[in-house]
């Protein structure tokens, strides 16, 4: 599923805590506790926002399910931009991809911090 976020054209965007709270609330009201996991799509969110939201969901609640990611664009976008079709940029792009994967792994464990992005 996607996370509960504000519409892309909304003049006011929900903060990280509100997105996490409303997404977890929605899951608690609609999913059985014996479901093993929920994996989220990034749903058009930025790389950092999708990571921050996942991390916050894992921090605010002891959920009966594992909350993780199934991101495509949110994992690949920065790496593709770094690569830009230039073979000379392959190593840098791989490092960018590896970093995003690591950040999302930490978010799935509720261990991500924004300072790790610098």
Where are these regions (language model features)?
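Active-site capping/gating regions of soluble enzymes
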Residues: 1-118
